[in-house]
Amino acid sequence: MKIKDAVNMIRWEYREKIDDYVIIIIDRLTENGLKEISFSELDAVDNNYLYLKSEENTVIPLHRVLMIKRKSDNALIWKR
């Protein structure tokens, strides 16, 4: 399954529990090199980028996405 398909599946099929899902990305500015982004922060996804709801209009390239997890049981939904 492609990243875009996994993101869209969660956004539309599990929208009632969207806060339970996070996207883990590579972020060189953090101490451990990883950053969690809640699905509630996500505005859109296309074939190349994640677009976040923010005043800065943050755009994250999909090649930085490492995995998608469910927080409640720490289940791995998608992994590179």
Swiss-Prot record:
Coiled coil residues, start to end: none
Pfam families: MJ1316 (PF04457)
Disulfide cysteine pairs (residue numbers): none
Family: Belongs to the UPF0248 family.
Name listed for the protein in its UniProt record: UPF0248 protein LS215_2790
Organism lineage: Archaea, Thermoproteota, Thermoprotei, Sulfolobales, Sulfolobaceae
